[in-house]
């Protein structure tokens, strides 16, 4: 039986119907609509979607329950939280695309692909089955491959799309191989049953369980931008259309964390691993590489790309210390939501700069406050939030993260690094 009124089904209907309708409208209209026309349709669908999820979430109407008889999707608060974060990013992306797509070709296809990618992200958040999760993963990935290279006349954009596609295909192959091993061990693709099977592995099967978890960490780590799976990220962010960079940096990254929390964390607990040490090492590597590389950049887009890598490390720190501090997981979830808003807003400001001035070099954006005061103000606020300056939202989530790290005895010196490159941008 299908619960047609469940959150993921309603979202798929709203976004799917709208996403398919936009190209159809474009074909049957005698006068082709502008980017504003199609963007408004996409924006309305996203607003209705996030309004529905927010109402369900805050009215306590969500009771964890299977949607299909096969238990492949579940309507729960975890999925709704990530759905809200992803829908916020998609809304920011669409709003930022109004000016960027003005006078550009194929706006109907562009906005339709954004909605289809959003469906994939939502499916990932609500999935409780490995097959459904992978379907959502590919539904998110394939539209973003096209969107990354949407500016076909720009060779940098073409290069970005090719790199993103090649690394994305490799990560998908790694994920499906890890899932295949998990299915071979458990005899089921249901995540709950897989975890139960992992919990009772004997010594002979334990290496296979470790291999499955390791491959899933590597595959999902690609989208999350974790070191050493981050090599594609700076070039792809630099070459993609700036609004799409916001979707990649703030949206698909969160989908990666949603998948990781659904599978990897519970899987490592079932294997009785000292998984906190492994995740902590990856988190420290990610923070270090991301922040140091960001300081060295002279291109605003690449700097924000490496900043995204660093913030992925912060989120992972909270997850890794969750067993030792009650605030760890809460802080990570709070920072996931904050980062979605902060990074999305920053890249939309960059989109405005690129559209109006066609520059991203740090030396050339000096005096931006005089030329584009509103855009400059939005960029400064988002960057200060990313740096964790009080009383902005980034400060409170970082305070929770590093407070929980102190409780767990972890190092917190890496919080200083982001301020160095952030203030390079906003200095007069």
Task: Describe each model-derived feature in a short phrase.
Residues 1-428:
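Alpha-helical transmembrane segments of multi-pass membrane proteins predominantly involved
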């Amino acid at each position: 039986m299908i619960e047609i009124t469940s959150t993921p089904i309603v979202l798929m209907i709203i976004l799917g119907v709208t996403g398919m309708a936009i190209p159809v409208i474009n074909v049957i209209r005698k006068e082709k609509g502008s980017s504003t026309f199609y963007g408004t349709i996409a924006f309305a669908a996203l607003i209705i979607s996030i309004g529905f999820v927010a109402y369900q979430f805050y009215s306590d109407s969500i009771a964890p329950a299977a949607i299909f008889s096969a238990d492949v999707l579940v309507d729960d608060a975890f999925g709704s939280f990530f759905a809200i974060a992803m829908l916020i990013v998609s809304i920011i992306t669409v709003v930022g695309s109004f000016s960027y797509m003005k006078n550009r070709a194929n706006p109907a296809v562009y906005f339709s692909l954004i909605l289809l990618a959003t469906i994939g992200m939502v499916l990932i958040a609500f999935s409780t089955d490995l097959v459904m999760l992978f379907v959502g993963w590919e539904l998110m990935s394939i539209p973003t491959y096209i969107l990354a290279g949407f500016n076909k006349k720009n060779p940098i954009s073409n290069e970005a799309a090719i790199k993103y596609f090649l690394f994305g295909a490799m990560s998908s192959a790694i994920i499906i191989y890890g899932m295949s091993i998990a299915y071979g061990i458990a005899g089921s693709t249901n995540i709950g049953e897989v975890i139960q099977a992992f919990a009772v592995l004997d010594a002979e099967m334990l290496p296979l369980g470790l291999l499955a978890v390791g491959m899933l960490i590597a595959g999902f780590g690609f989208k999350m931008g974790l070191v050493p799976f981050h090599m594609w990220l700076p070039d792809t962010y630099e070459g993609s259309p700036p609004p799409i960079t916001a979707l990649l940096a703030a949206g698909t990254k969160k989908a990666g964390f949603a998948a990781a929390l659904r599978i990897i964390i519970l899987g490592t607990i079932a294997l009785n691993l000292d998984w906190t040490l492994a995740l902590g090492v990856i988190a420290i590597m990610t923070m270090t590489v991301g922040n140091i590389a960001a300081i060295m950049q002279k291109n605003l887009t690449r700097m924000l790309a490496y900043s995204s890598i660093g913030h992925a490390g912060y989120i992972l720190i909270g997850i890794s210390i969750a067993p030792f501090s009650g605030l760890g997981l809460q802080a990570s979830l709070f920072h996931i939501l904050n980062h979605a808003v902060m990074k999305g807003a920053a890249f939309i400001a960059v989109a405005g700069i690129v559209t109006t001035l066609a520059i991203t070099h740090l030396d050339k954006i000096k005096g931006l406050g005089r030329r584009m005061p509103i855009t400059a103000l939005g960029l400064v606020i988002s960057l200060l939030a990313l740096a964790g300056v009080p009383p902005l939202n980034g400060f409170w989530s970082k305070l929770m993260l590093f407070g929980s790290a102190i409780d767990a005895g972890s190092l917190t010196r890496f919080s200083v690094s982001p301020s160095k490159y952030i203030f390079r941008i906003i200095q007069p």
